[in-house]
């Protein structure tokens, strides 16, 4: 999965951030998500585009997997965002079984070994870096 501060509100990162801001401002008092145990590989869209550019410009016809190669749980995302706003997510989180996808694999992440070996490429921003960029953007939007 790729993320950036330009994502629309329907995506997970922005949903978590929006709820935390709303809770901090007493506009909302809960965040409903599916399982917090789901783990995914999230990379910054800018890093992904740099990788795509390298692949296209190489003209070698090879297939490459682009990603961080690191699974991160939804729980980790929620904890980071809520901690950023000095909130304890446990006071606001509600698991909603209706948000669970059937047959969803619990852990899903990439193996970017080949692109690193061939081009020296790897993601520059961590998941927390991406979350901070997204939070900063949302705070700008809320304050304008």
Per-segment meaning from a language model:
Residues 9:
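Active-site loop immediately N-terminal to the catalytic Tyr-X3-Lys motif
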């Amino acid at each position: 999965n790729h993320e950036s501060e330009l994502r629309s509100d329907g995506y997970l990162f922005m949903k978590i951030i929006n709820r935390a801001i709303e809770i901090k401002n007493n506009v909302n008092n809960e965040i409903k998500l599916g399982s917090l145990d789901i783990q995914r590989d999230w990379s910054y869209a800018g890093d992904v585009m740099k990788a795509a550019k390298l692949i296209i410009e190489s003209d070698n016809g090879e297939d490459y997997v682009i990603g961080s190669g690191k699974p991160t749980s939804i729980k980790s995302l929620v904890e980071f965002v809520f901690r950023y706003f000095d909130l304890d997510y446990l006071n606001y989180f509600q698991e909603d079984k209706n948000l669970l996808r059937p047959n969803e694999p619990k852990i899903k992440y990439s193996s970017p070994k080949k692109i690193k070996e061939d081009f020296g490429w790897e993601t520059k921003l961590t998941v927390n870096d991406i979350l901070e960029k997204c939070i900063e953007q949302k705070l700008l939007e809320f304050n304008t």
